[in-house]
Amino acid sequence: MMNMKEDKKNTMDMTNMKHHDERKKLNSSQGKNEIIFPEVAESKKDNNGYKNYTLKAQKGKTEFYKNNFSNTLGYNGNLLGPTLKLKKGDKVKIKLINNLDENTTFHWHGLEVNGKVDGGPSQVIKPGKEKTIKFEVNQDSATLWYHPHPSPNTAKQVYNGLSGLLYIEDSKKNNYPSNYGKNDLPIIIQDKTFVSKKLNYSKTKDEDGTQGDTVLVNGIVNPKLTAKEEKIRLRLLNGSNARDLNLKLSNNQSFEYIASDGGQLKNAKKLKEINLAPSERKEIVIDLSKMKGEKVSLVDNDKTVILPISNKEKSSNKSNTPKVSKKIKLEGMNDNVTINGNKFDPNRIDFTQKLNQKEVWEIENVKDKMGGMKHPFHIHGTQFKVLSVDGEKPPKDMRGKKDVISLEPGQKAKIEVVFKNTGTYMFHCHILEHEDNGMMGQIKVTN
């Protein structure tokens, strides 16, 4: 029989223990930074009909707060990973590369595949090693995700940035928004704690589930979303280590709940709130056209603002441009600058183009976690025509023949490019220090 002293001691121990379901206070987003959306992963189809992808788990640095860089992890970049868009019936081949200093795996959360390629703890890829997996997609449309699953370091690797989305695209016609990054929006919600404005998992780790005091959406601190006055589809992932979310709109308006973890519902449901456990996904459609002029936010049940949403009117000044043949992504600041994720290599030809052939290039100044900076983009050996900026007709001072276009963070332009001579030409940012730091590429023009 337990004596009185033991009983008193155990009672005190239980009193001092933190309850497993206790919620750490989460601070509201101040809505200072526009969210950015993960890039869509590019694939190449081989002669056997497989869509080929490459995913690298790698180390990086992320500027969550101005002039404060955190050590982070990402897939094919500094933080998070690209979105893989698949369809039912696709045959898929993915080269998985571990560029970390520790073991990792690549787990396809929610994907129905053979256990040999599921990416569980037994399917370790060691540092510096790689392997290729194959599978066929046998599921209907759904929002899934991928993340590491190495024992015992899953929590640490996910917290530090290893997460990405995987769509199985709509196979049946429906009226749901489907323009990725415009009205079909991936929303990865996470909570983290920053120590002196830097990530430090070891100092914030909790064995009963690490919860943070700062909300991030798609890796952005103090996020906000600006969207047109139309229906928008939010593909919500609770990518937190341990925090449950109970999401609703701040104006208490209802929305359509259209899909759960495994895919679309037979019939959409009108709801005013949804629960999201860690790793859970749900899709909702919000009709912003019915909320003109309103300040609305996606909030957690304790009124914590997760994502302020502001409306912008539909633009009537759209510019119709031909199909894009080349995409240029300008990224970074200081010496962390790249074009399409690459530093300049004199032995690498990035693009080719035929002599006298008109092509449309899309130039994007990718906004980073702190907003980024303006980049003047220059092409050697040609004068180009600016067709559009952010989908609209270019401003008057961007018309006429040009060889430099300067883009603000987040801006995207389409330009018409024709080369009248053959040879190898440079394209680069014309901030000279950025050029010297590798923000440059090469195009070869041939007959």
Curated annotation (Swiss-Prot):
Q: Which PANTHER family match?
A: BILIRUBIN OXIDASE, CUPREDOXIN SUPERFAMILY PROTEIN
Enzyme Commission no: 1.-.-.-
**GO MF, any single term:** copper ion binding
The task this protein performs is described as:
May be involved in copper homeostasis and oxidative stress response.
**Co-factor: note:** Binds 4 Cu cations per monomer.
| Entry keyword annotation includes Kinase | no
Q: Which SUPFAM superfamilies match?
A: Cupredoxins
Q: Name one Pfam family in it.
A: Cu-oxidase_3
Question: What is the protein name given in its UniProt record?
Answer: Multicopper oxidase mco
* Family statement drawn from the similarity comment of this UniProt entry: Belongs to the multicopper oxidase family.
Keyword presence, Cytoplasm? yes
Q: Where does Cu cation 2 bind?
A: H109, H147, H430
Lineage, opening ranks: Bacteria, Bacillati, Bacillota, Bacilli, Bacillales
- Detail which positions bind Cu cation 4: H375, C429, H434, M439
Q: Which organism is it from?
A: Staphylococcus haemolyticus (strain JCSC1435)
Q: Where is the composition biased (Basic and acidic residues)?
A: 1-25
Question: Which residues does Cu cation 1 bind?
Answer: H107, H378
Lineage top rank: taxon? Bacteria
Report the locations given in the UniProt record: Cytoplasm
PROSITE patterns per the UniProt record, alphabetical: MULTICOPPER_OXIDASE1, MULTICOPPER_OXIDASE2
Example GO CC term: the record gives: cytoplasm
The ranges of region (Disordered) come to 1-29
The entry's keywords: Copper, Cytoplasm, Metal-binding, Oxidoreductase
InterPro entries in the cross-refs: Cu-oxidase-like_N, Cu-oxidase_C, Cu-oxidase_fam, Cu_oxidase_CS, Cu_oxidase_Cu_BS, Cupredoxin
